[in-house]
């Protein structure tokens, strides 16, 4: 076949491979594999390898590309060698050139190839040694990322080298010469190691396939061999064009028969719409809470479950709702929440997220539940396990609060004052760092919301906390800030004392039925108040009342 026709075929091959990879994502790995088999990937393996390691593509989905290369291992093993070697060389070049994002994408690709046994682990260990030679923050971050993605695989196949890498990172952490960001990354990696890297490696749903492990290494002593292959993906004339077509036809038939046969054998997965696992997990958490004598015991049992991020959110929700269902608030739940927040930094985040979710649905809770939850959150704030960023979702105004939310906030602040004292609470709220977090709770614009907030805190007995808000009011409003409505009108609050009813001078009416001695005595007693018909006529005409003559009683 002449060169011009081969070049046209090459261009069509390149465009097809590029379009398939552009549409690639985690849900289309198997479909992309079938679409690539529509063209001669034996001839285009160089194009496929060069497109896989392209910077803009690797940065976005390095691990997904590694899974796609893994599927071709049983049919075109040369592709795994080309991609592994090119990714190693490009990482070395990009790291020296300071292209950090590209380095992280290549690391994700290499870790996926190593986890699936396409590439031998010696390549990753060489990269780890190179990163440790320059213990800068950038190198430490990449090394922690690599161990987070492939640490479980390295621990299984080369435990000694894996432990040595962790020991080096631990020594660097203890030296104290790293930035806080790098120190936090190392600490997070050590926590992952204690959990045996649970849930860290990316797993894809792939059909059964064979794998051939390639021992690809960097020849560091020969600088000329450390440059990426510039001819990868370039056009070349295939002198055995038709033989290559026959080989690909046989390969494609074998691959599709195996691939489609497995899809037919696989039954349609049953999706559990009853959430039975979630219900069972919640039941287990509830039984732990009810079967524990102290909050410390409950926290110990819950932490032994080693929950992930989503399970932590479930546990936090059950703890708060179980506290709300109690007859009265008990410190059991407060101590439990303290122990959970002190064990890992993700727990306070889960509690904060739950507070924001519950605050919008407070109208669904009963008054007793509002009291228990308010005291719970007040206890957590007083214990300083949750910050004042809890109040970022609170806007204290007449139109943005409900009676339920006002009652809820009242119990929070009353619990805070009971635990810390009014002086300490005021000190925390007036701190400069806390002002942006509580500006919705203590508005200082000098408008109706400010007046409403002042009246609210004054009504619940915490008017001391409103001193900073009163300074933002106009002069006339300052004098009436305790008795002003949100519309600016002066409010007259009734006294807490109920005034006594004025006693009437007229005698009480006594109803006596029938003729009896009692009726005679009553008429005789009240006869002095009836001056007679003549006097009544004079009173109507003169509009004056002449009191009856008093009788002298000796």
Curated annotation (Swiss-Prot):
GO CC terms in record: catalytic step 2 spliceosome; cytoplasm; Prp19 complex; U2-type spliceosomal complex
MIF4G domain span: 14-196
Transferase recorded as keyword: no
Any one GO molecular function term: RNA binding
Family annotation (SUPFAM superfamilies): ARM repeat
Pfam families cross-referenced by the UniProt entry: MA3
Polar residues bias locations: 473-493
Comp. bias regions, Basic residues: 498-511
Matches recorded under InterPro entries: ARM-type_fold, CWC22_splicing_factor, Initiation_fac_eIF4g_MI
SMART domains per UniProt: MA3
UniProt keyword list: Cytoplasm, mRNA processing, mRNA splicing, Nucleus, Spliceosome
Keyword Nucleus listed: yes
One GO-annotated biological process of the protein: mRNA splicing, via spliceosome
Localization in the cell: Cytoplasm; Nucleus
UniProt feature, compositional bias: Basic and acidic residues: 512-528
Family the UniProt entry places it in: Belongs to the CWC22 family.
Function: May be involved in pre-mRNA splicing.
Subunit structure, interactors included: Associated with the spliceosome.
Protein name per UniProt: Pre-mRNA-splicing factor CWC22
Organism annotation: Eremothecium gossypii (strain ATCC 10895 / CBS 109.51 / FGSC 9923 / NRRL Y-1056) (Yeast)
UniProt gene name: CWC22
